[in-house]
Design a protein with these regions (language model features):
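Extended, amphipathic alpha-helical scaffolds
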Residues: 259-265
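Generic detector of low-complexity/intrinsically disordered segments
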Residues: 4-5, 70, 98, 227
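Short, Lys/Arg-enriched N-terminal segments with co-localized hydrophobic residues
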Residues: 1-11
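Charged, low-complexity surface segments at secondary-structure and domain boundaries
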Residues: 3, 47, 218-220
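General structural signal for secondary-structure boundaries
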Residues: 74, 78-81, 229, 233-239, ...
Length: 265
């Protein structure tokens, strides 16, 4: 983060969060509410909702009504297969030298093509938080040399699946070095050159922790929520809250119930 004096000069906006799932948005609420409790003069934040893997429907409208964020912006993020000119650079030639050269070209071209769909100037923000920087935004920020904070995609997700190591298996150390030190390719989850750090829930649970990992447990943020905080979150996430509460009240008079929660991801 930049010094607080910089904010007072009005030179930059404070924070921006890039979310790809409802869970990302939930953790963003936890982080932002915690910050508001601890720093009364922390300023306002911007929330970016990527449509890459989720249809957020009217979530942005409900969040806007809470007043927690200064802006809610939709991001029409594009996967690499949206750009047919990138296909040839993803082919496996069976040779690490040829593959790495193609990957270097792919990394630069992908970031350049993605730029047309980026809805915000990230350079205007002092702190950028990105959930799942393996998505196109990670390529974009690193190629544009814009520092950012990565945030663990799910709860202890790297413990169960270390995507960076799996997707870069075979000469991982070399690939991590090409990404972290030279920015010639991009490796997610803390190995990008412009990734300042990556927040994870529990470092001790991760078999191969990256030096950039910092531990930010999520349960204490949940435990610290006030009644008012919880109501704000409910108002943001529940689409037909009054109708749902009415159904629950009616169900209480009938007897035992089962609530089934599903997640498309």
């Amino acid at each position: 983060a930049l010094p607080s004096e910089f904010w007072k000069a009005g030179s930059m906006k404070e924070r921006i969060y890039v979310c790809h799932t409802y869970y990302h948005v939930y953790v963003t609420f936890l982080k932002e509410l915690k910050l508001r409790r601890e720093q009364k003069d922390c300023g306002e934040a911007t929330l970016v909702l990527s449509r890459l893997s989720n249809d957020f429907e009217q979530l942005d409208e409900r969040i806007r009504k809470t007043g927690l964020f200064a802006e809610i912006i939709s991001f029409d993020e594009k996967r690499d297969d949206f750009f047919p000119e990138l296909k040839k650079y993803r082919e496996d030639h069976g040779n690490i030298v040829f593959n790495m050269i193609n990957r270097m070209i792919f990394t630069r071209k992908y970031a350049r093509l993605e730029e047309a769909y980026v809805p915000v100037d990230f350079r205007e923000y002092g702190d950028i938080y990105v959930f799942c920087d393996s998505d196109p935004v990670g390529y974009y920020l690193n190629q544009k040399k814009i520092p950012y904070h990565a945030v663990e995609d799910g709860l202890n997700c790297i413990k169960n699946f270390d995507a960076a190591r799996f997707e870069n298996r075979g000469h991982f150390g070399l690939k991590a070095w090409l990404s972290r030190e030279l920015n010639l390719i991009f490796v997610q989850n803390g190995y990008g050159k412009y990734c300042l750090d990556m927040e994870v829930n529990d470092i001790s649970a991760i078999k191969y922790p990256c030096p950039q990992y910092i531990e930010v447990p999520r349960q204490p943020m949940v435990d610290a929520l006030s009644g008012e905080d919880k109501q704000l979150i409910l108002n943001a996430f529940i689409r037909n809250r009054e109708e749902l509460e009415r159904q629950i009240e009616e169900g209480n008079r009938i007897g035992k119930k089962i609530l089934i929660l599903t997640d498309p991801l």
